Amino acid sequence: VASLEAFLRGRLCTAGATAAALTAAAHTLAACARRPWPLLDAEADARTASPAQRDAARTQGRLLLRVARRVWPSPVLDELAGAVPSPHHPLALGAAAHAAGATSEEAALAAAYHAVAGPATAAVRLLGLDPVDVHGVLAGLAPDLAAAARTPHPADWAALPAGAAPALDLLAEAHARAQTRMFVS
């Protein structure tokens, strides 16, 4: 469990911080009169080195956007779907959070949590770790998750974080080509 905690902390500082910032940017963009969704989506592309990770993020974003449009009908969500039919997950999450009435910080917190909860769940399933121990690790990350959500997010999208984990990118590419696939993300 100690190595899982170290992994999750590293993930939160890289992919989690990037996803939180992109989600907050999407939430902010959703409140604007002019919404250049394709430009923000390109920023997400630029921060996701692995094509397999980009495909997974777009699949998750498309599916989330589909559900969000039914649960929280909104012109903003319709506009995002028209501009970017398969947006990166953080864009869909930020826009959906806006449509649901959540704050930018709440949206960023959801993105940060998503970045660590998925791998934590996979560790329980694939490594046979005790779920109570793993959830204890997640609970211990709460202050760091809150800090990631509170981090000021620059208005200049080029200045958004771009934390990377090259080893995970390589694993994602190998997994995408594997005959037996366990997860998409």
Locate the predicted segments by residue.
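Glycine/small-residue-rich interface belts in oligomeric ring/scaffold proteins
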Residues: V1-R35
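Amphipathic alpha-helical segments within well-ordered protein domains
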Residues: E5-R9, A24, L65, G94, ...
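A generic local secondary-structure boundary/capping motif
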Residues: R11-L12, Q53, D169-A172
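Electropositive phosphate-/nucleotide-binding environments in soluble metabolic enzymes
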Residues: A17, P51-R54, R58, P87, ...
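Internal, conserved structured core segments that host functional sites
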Residues: A20-A25, C32-G101
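Active-site rim beta-loop-alpha module in soluble metabolic enzymes
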Residues: A100-E106, H114, T121
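C-terminal auxiliary extensions adjacent to catalytic cores
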Residues: A111-S185
